[in-house]
Amino acid sequence: MPFLDHDRGRAYYRHWATDEPRAAVVFLHGFGEHTGVYHRYGFALNAAGIDLWAVDQFGHGLSPGDRGDFGSIEDSSALADSLTALAAEAGVPVIAQGHSFGAIVTLFRLLDGDTRAAAAVISGAPLVPVAELLDADTSVQLDPDWLSADPFYLDTLENDPLAFVDADTTALARELDRGWDRFGADLPGLEVPTLAVHGIADPIASIGAVRAYAEQINPLQLQEFPGRHDILNENVHREVAAAIVDFIDAQL
């Protein structure tokens, strides 16, 4: 199996490859997920001539770590750095993408001046505090109905031993809080063309915050879809993937 080396251990990654890619997406998943829940998305990108690279972050999937503990934003960013280096070997534009916590890491990378990303995509981005995580001393249990209404996806989550909806969230809340402290001052300085795709009925990450930022920040576009938090795995997943492909096309 392919792994990325890191001080915390070896992190598993997947590569959905096309024969002649015209772009590559480097993807960071969210809490409780792993790369294996994104096959549909990978195949949709492949059909459009785009490679997808994704890593099981620490505490998730086949990578080491306590359940649900991503470590620091810098830990996840280092994994994205390694994956970006692999994706760039094809000599095609690289698109940075993240979902939920992965979106927070992706935005940190852009604001810190990562020049390798031609553009970025974020989904389910929690840009303001999440009520369930304000008490960092407790664990969280997500209601699967908060995530998606797609019965296929919900069945996958229920029967996937690598996916989960509950874990200690001390580390997660700590790192998200860093984002919430930073974004008010720094996010208006975003310079990289970025598409936010978001479910109108997302009960975890408020779409209102994304709307407000998109109105202020010229490079940040928002496309809204009927659905909940895991919009890439919602009933409208085809439409969401198509919107992302259209956005990438416009950047090439």
Regions found by a protein language model. Give the residues of each.
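The alpha/beta-hydrolase serine catalytic core
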Residues: 116-189, 232
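N-terminal cap/lid segment of alpha/beta-hydrolase-fold proteins
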Residues: 1-17
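Conserved alpha/beta-hydrolase "acid-adjacent" motif
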Residues: 203-209
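Conserved alpha/beta-hydrolase
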Residues: 35-37, 42-66
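Catalytic active-site module of serine/aspartate enzymes centered on a nucleophile-bearing elbow/loop
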Residues: 220-252
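Short beta-strand/loop motif that positions the catalytic acidic residue
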Residues: 190, 196-198, 202
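Active-site glycine-rich loops that stabilize anionic/oxyanionic intermediates
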Residues: 22, 30-33, 200
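Catalytic nucleophile-loop/oxyanion-hole region of alpha/beta-hydrolase
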Residues: 31-34, 61-90
